[in-house]
């Protein structure tokens, strides 16, 4: 039997064919990301970040303010629709922003009206304002749930950013 016998040639062809088939399977079977696809993914992430950007839409969720400020018992239909349409990753951030704007405006208005008031009257107002702020934060945290938003999060972790948010205050 020589080196190029028919059985050796067939065996070599089988191994070569198997190798080519495996190479093609791995080459086309494993997903790869080329520069164009990677750039498209990056643009999608940037677009999502921009969609959460508070500067893009400063009046976002303004229809929910009356509910948070206790001028309404339930959020308006428009408020709930806006929340429902909003992307889940932006929802709590938008609620926090709207609450912060509302509280900072109220704090500014309070500071103007309290300048000439007696000290103990200003303290009572601050205590009352602190309770109102607590209620607004609670309403804000559960706003997605109150509106029956289907996608999570249905509760937001709301942070305090107001000058009235002192812990262990001496105003009692």
UniProtKB/Swiss-Prot annotation:
Coiled-coil zones: none
Keyword Signal attached: yes
Stretches for region Disordered: 108-172
Extent of the signal sequence: 1-35
UniProtKB keywords: Seed storage protein, Signal, Storage protein
GO terms of molecular function: nutrient reservoir activity
Pfam families given in the database record: Tryp_alpha_amyl
Stored SMART domains: AAI
Record-linked InterPro entries: Bifun_inhib/LTP/seed_sf, Bifunc_inhib/LTP/seed_store, Napin/2SS/CON
Compositional bias segments (type: Basic and acidic residues): 151-160
Family: Belongs to the 2S seed storage albumins family.
Descriptive protein name: 2S seed storage-like protein
Organism classification: Eukaryota, Viridiplantae, Streptophyta, Embryophyta, Tracheophyta
């Amino acid at each position: 039997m020589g080196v190029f016998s028919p059985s050796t040639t067939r065996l070599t062809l089988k191994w070569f064919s198997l190798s080519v088939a495996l190479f093609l399977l791995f080459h086309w079977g494993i997903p790869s990301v080329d520069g164009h696809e990677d750039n498209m993914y990056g643009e999608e992430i940037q677009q999502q970040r921009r969609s959460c950007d508070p500067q893009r839409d400063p009046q976002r969720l303004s229809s929910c303010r009356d509910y948070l400020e206790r001028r309404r018992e339930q959020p308006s239909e428009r408020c709930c629709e806006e929340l429902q349409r909003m992307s889940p990753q932006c929802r709590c951030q938008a609620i926090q922003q709207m609450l912060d704007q509302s509280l900072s405006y109220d704090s500014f208005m309070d500071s103007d009206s309290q300048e000439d008031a007696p000290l103990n009257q200003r303290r009572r107002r601050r205590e009352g304002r602190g309770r109102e702020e607590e209620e607004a934060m609670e309403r804000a945290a559960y706003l997605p749930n109150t509106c029956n938003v289907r996608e999570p999060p249905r509760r937001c972790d709301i942070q305090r950013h107001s000058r009235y948010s002192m812990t262990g205050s001496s105003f009692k």
